[in-house]
């Protein structure tokens, strides 16, 4: 049995669904929401690489590397902002962040 395009798309769909569920089911912790967004981006990357390999075109793989770079920068900046916010406020609950003005 060979691993085909359908298998990669199924894994990507499962990861994407888990990321969406993580966002909708846990709205209290910002770190979990950030990790869920990263999971969604990982699912998109898996689909890009799978379609790229299936079609024999390298553009999807290059775009996946670009998305991976942007996702890493987004995670680093997001975690840095959360650390600074936690040091100032003492909490990272979504309700507390919604009260932030200005």
Curated annotation (Swiss-Prot):
Its EC number is 7.1.1.-. It is an enzyme of class 7 (translocase). The chain crosses the membrane at residues 5-25, 30-50, 62-82. It comes from the Bacteria. It catalyses: a quinone + NADH + 5 H(+)(in) = a quinol + NAD(+) + 4 H(+)(out). It is a multi-pass membrane protein. Belongs to the complex I subunit 4L family. NDH-1 is composed of 14 different subunits. Subunits NuoA, H, J, K, L, M, N constitute the membrane sector of the complex. NDH-1 shuttles electrons from NADH, via FMN and iron-sulfur (Fe-S) centers, to quinones in the respiratory chain. The immediate electron acceptor for the enzyme in this species is believed to be ubiquinone. Couples the redox reaction to proton translocation (for every two electrons transferred, four hydrogen ions are translocated across the cytoplasmic membrane), and thus conserves the redox energy in a proton gradient. This is NADH-quinone oxidoreductase subunit K. It comes from Nitrobacter hamburgensis (strain DSM 10229 / NCIMB 13809 / X14). The gene is nuoK.
């Amino acid at each position: 049995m060979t691993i085909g395009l359908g298998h990669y798309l199924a894994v990507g769909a499962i990861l994407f669904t888990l990321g969406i569920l993580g966002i909708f089911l846990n709205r209290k912790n910002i770190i979990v929401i950030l990790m869920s967004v990263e999971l969604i981006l990982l699912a998109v990357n898996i689909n890009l690489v799978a379609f790229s390999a299936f079609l024999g075109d390298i553009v999807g793989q290059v775009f996946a590397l670009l998305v991976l770079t942007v996702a890493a920068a987004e995670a680093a900046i997001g975690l840095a902002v959360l650390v600074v916010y936690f040091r100032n406020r003492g909490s990272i609950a979504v309700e507390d962040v919604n009260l932030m003005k200005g």
